[in-house]
Amino acid sequence: MTYLEIEGTNHLSGNVTISGAKNAALPLIVSSILAKNEVKINNVPNVADIKTLISLLENLGAKVNFQNNSALLNTNTLNQTIAKYDIVRKMRASILTLGPLLARFGHCEVSLPGGCAIGQRPIDLHLLALEKMGANIQIKQGYVVASGNLKGNEILFDKITVTGSENIIMAAALAKGKTKLLNVAKEPEVVQLCEVLKDAGLEIKGIGTDELEIYGSDGELLEFKEFSVIPDRIEAGTYLCAGAITNSKITLDKVNATHLSAVLAKLHQMGFETLIAEDSITLLPAKEIKPVEIMTSEYPGFPTDMQAQFMALALKANGTSIIDERLFENRFMHVSELLRMGADIKLNGHIATIVGGKELNAADVMATDLRASSALILAALAAKGTSKVHRIYHLDRGYENLEEKFKGLGVKITRLEE
C-alpha cells in the first residue's frame, strides 16, 4: 500500500495552478452519450475517478482518447447499455449514466453504486423523477433496470441533489416535450452542464436558478461544441486552507473566485485577507487566526466538501470553533485520526466543537475518504515532526498531481510504498 510522508512546516510560498473540477468533468463526460458528434473536452483533471468513468464508457462501447488533460469522446459506437458492477462499485458518480443511457436507448441497466442503500443517499430521487417521466424502473440483483420512452413532466426534488439534478437534466434533454424541474441544485458544476447542453442546441431556461425548463429534442442527438471544464473550487479551497494553516502567503492560478464566495468569507472571518484578480487568488497571512462557526449547506452556502479542511484549520485558531454538518451523515470520520495528532475535538451528533491553539504532533494516520484525507495532510503540515498518511488512494480519486503541487509550495512530501 502507498502512503505519504509529510514533514511539518512553518511556511509555504509560491504559486499553485488549480486543475479542472472533477465534479464538473464527470457529468460533462457522461453527457457525451447525448452527442451525435465527437466531443472534445479540455481541462479534464487526470485523477482516478475520471479514469474509472472513461473505463465505464469504453466498456459501453465508446471510443475515448484521453491525454494532456483533453478527452475526445465518440459515443456513436456505443453497443452496450449495461453499466456493470465491477466498474460502478468504484465510484458513485457512475449512476449519472442512468438518465442519458435511458433517454438515448429506451432501456438500460446500471449497477447500484457500491454500498449505496436506497433511501440513505438520494439515488431514490433520481428514480422517482425518471418514473414521473414515464420510465419503468425495477431493482433486480443490485441493478437499476430501466425502460421506456421518456416524456417531459413537472418534477419537484424533495431534497436538493446535485447528481440527481444532473441525471434528470441529461434525461430531459432527449425526452419528448417540456420538463420543468423544481428545487434544482445550483452548484457551478450543474450550471456548466446546462450551459454546455444549451450550446449543443438544447433549449433550456432558468440556468443558475433552482427552476429549470428543458424542451427535450424527442430523441434527436445534440451537436456538441468544444469546451473546457471549470476550475475545481474544492481543490482551490484545499490549497487556500494549506496556506492558512501555515499562515503563509500563496497564490492560486486558474481559479474562479466567484465559486469560492462562502469559503473566502470564512477565511476572512478567521483573519485572513485575499487579493483577487481575474483568475487568481492570493492569500495573505493573518495577524491572528480567529475561531469560526460553519454550517454546511447547498451552494451558494458553505460546501460540505470543505468541512474537513476547515476543521483542520480551526485547530490553529485562537479559541473554540463550531462546525455543523447539515448535509451528510458519517462526515466526521477524520476526527478520530486528528485526535491522534493531539487535536481537541468533541462530537455531538452533526456538530463538532474544535478547541484550537494546541500543538499538533506528527502521527501515523489513515484516510477514510477523499476530503478527510486532505484534512489529514493539512494537519500534517501544521504538526511538529513527520507524519505518515495511509490509504492515499482516496486522494488520488480527486486531487491531480498533489505531491508536485505541494512541493511547488515548499512542502517536504514523499509518496512511499509500505
Swiss-Prot record:
Pathway: Cell wall biogenesis; peptidoglycan biosynthesis
E.C. number(s) listed in UniProt: 2.5.1.7
SUPFAM superfamilies per UniProt: EPT/RTPC-like
Binding-site list for UDP-N-acetyl-alpha-D-glucosamine: R92, R121, P122, I123, D124, L125, D305, L327
Enzyme class: transferase
Catalytic activity: phosphoenolpyruvate + UDP-N-acetyl-alpha-D-glucosamine = UDP-N-acetyl-3-O-(1-carboxyvinyl)-alpha-D-glucosamine + phosphate
Presence of the UniProt keyword Cell division in the record: yes
Pfam families found in the cross-reference section: EPSP_synthase
Family: Belongs to the EPSP synthase family. MurA subfamily.
PANTHER family from the UniProt entry: UDP-N-ACETYLGLUCOSAMINE 1-CARBOXYVINYLTRANSFERASE
Name of the featured protein: UDP-N-acetylglucosamine 1-carboxyvinyltransferase
Species per Swiss-Prot/TrEMBL record: Campylobacter jejuni (strain RM1221)
Taxon lineage: Bacteria, Pseudomonadati, Campylobacterota, Epsilonproteobacteria, Campylobacterales
Gene: murA
